[in-house]
Structure formats: structure tokens, C-alpha cells
């Protein structure tokens, strides 16, 4: 499926500028066109609110998408908002998480929910930097919540997006190097600033194309 996206870039090879910023901007239309036809139907994309985006991103760490789907549905039914998550006892929380593994993720979710109740009035802050302060949230998750739920130009760079950028730029460098990831993060942030609409679709498209 993702190969169709890369194939769609071939007719543009003579037109896409060499500069990485311009090449990234020029690839946006083919990427979104591919995404509209091939996007994965995922429950957390149906209503990308801050809470549901946050829960899904934490669950998806180290866990396959298909495995997460039933857990996400059950978790959201039992704990539909920050308030219920902050108040749940640990035994019930871990029971809901049972089978996903990496139980520190669940414990950090509750810790973060308590912080949100105490410091942010029970709301997820609309700021990547503020989201980063919460327990268990790293750079990617903070960027995903800020950009997908709040439509902010916050980069969310994971392995899938890195694969797309490496292919797009024909970059021979080791994609695990921190310096390269920092460069990609700057490029992605600049593109999100330039792009004033469809930021959520743009980032989701990059994630799907990199599978």
C-alpha cells in the first residue's frame, strides 16, 4: 500500500527541488492524495480529542496497532476522560491494561491525569512544552497530542515518519543518529508552520506511509 505513495513521487522527480525544505513541501500533495485513498481506519482517529490521542499514543508504544484496538475501546469505555482516569484505583487500572505489558505506562497515565487535575483544571494543555512536563510523555507523544488534537505546528517524529523522510530525501545516513532526527524534526516543524490546514491528516499520512 505505502509503495503507491512512493510511486506517486516518481513523475515529480524532475520538478521537486533539491532543497530539503522545498522537497518536503512539494511532496505534501501526493502524500495527502495517497492518504485519502489508503488511510487506515483507526478508532482513535474518529474523534481526535486530546485525551483519546494521548491514550492511544501511549498504548501504541511497543505495541502493534491491531493489538491496541480492543484495549483502546475497553479503556475509553471504562475511563472516558481525565477525571475518571485520575480517580481510578490502581488495581482496576492495571486490570484494564492487563495483556498490553509495560505496566509503567498505565501507572504514568494515572500520575499524569492527577497532575492535569491539580495543575491544569482537568484539561490537557494546548502547548507541546507543557504536555512534555507530564509523567510518561516524551517528545513524540507531546508532538502528536499538540498537532493532532490542537492543530499546532508541533512535530511528531517516530520511526515511520523517519522512514518516509529518509526515502524522500534519499538520505544514506543512519536514521537512528540523534543529529539526523533533530534535523528531520526541524524540517517537519517548519513544514507544519507553513501548512495551515490538514496538519492532523498530514502527520497521520506520514505515519501510515512509513509502515
Question: What is each stretch, according to the model?
Answer:
Residues 24:
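Active-site neighborhood of HAD-like aspartate-dependent phosphohydrolases
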Residues 8-11, 16-21, 30, 34-211:
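Catalytic cores of DNA base-excision repair glycosylases
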Amino acid at each position: 500500500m505505502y509503495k503507491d505513495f512512493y510511486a506517486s513521487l516518481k513523475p515529480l522527480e524532475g520538478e521537486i527541488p533539491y532543497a530539503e525544505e522545498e522537497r518536503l513541501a512539494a511532496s505534501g500533495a501526493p502524500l495527502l492524495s495517497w492518504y485519502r485513498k489508503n488511510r487506515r481506519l483507526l478508532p482513535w482517529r474518529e474523534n481526535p480529542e486530546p485525551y483519546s490521542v494521548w491514550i492511544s499514543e501511549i498504548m501504541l508504544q511497543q505495541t502493534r496497532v491491531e493489538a491496541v484496538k480492543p484495549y483502546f475501546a475497553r479503556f475509553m469505555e471504562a475511563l472516558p476522560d481525565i477525571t475518571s482516569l485520575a480517580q481510578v484505583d490502581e488495581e482496576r487500572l492495571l486490570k484494564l491494561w492487563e495483556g498490553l505489558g509495560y505496566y509503567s505506562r498505565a501507572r504514568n497515565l494515572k500520575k499524569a491525569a492527577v497532575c492535569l487535575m491539580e495543575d491544569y483544571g482537568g484539561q490537557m494543555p494546548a502547548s507541546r512544552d507543557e504536555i512534555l512536563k507530564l509523567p510518561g510523555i516524551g517528545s513524540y507523544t507531546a508532538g502528536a497530542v499538540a498537532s493532532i488534537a490542537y492543530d499546532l505546528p508541533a512535530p511528531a517524529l517516530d520511526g515511520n515518519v523517519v522512514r518516509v523522510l529518509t526515502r524522500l530525501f534519499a538520505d544514506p545516513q543512519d536514521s537512528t543518529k540523534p543529529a539526523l532526527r533533530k534535523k528531520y524534526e526541524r524540517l517537519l516543524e517548519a513544514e507544519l508552520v507553513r501548512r495551515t490546514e490538514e496538519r492532523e491528516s498530514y502527520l497521520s499520512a506520514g505515519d501510515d506511509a512509513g509502515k
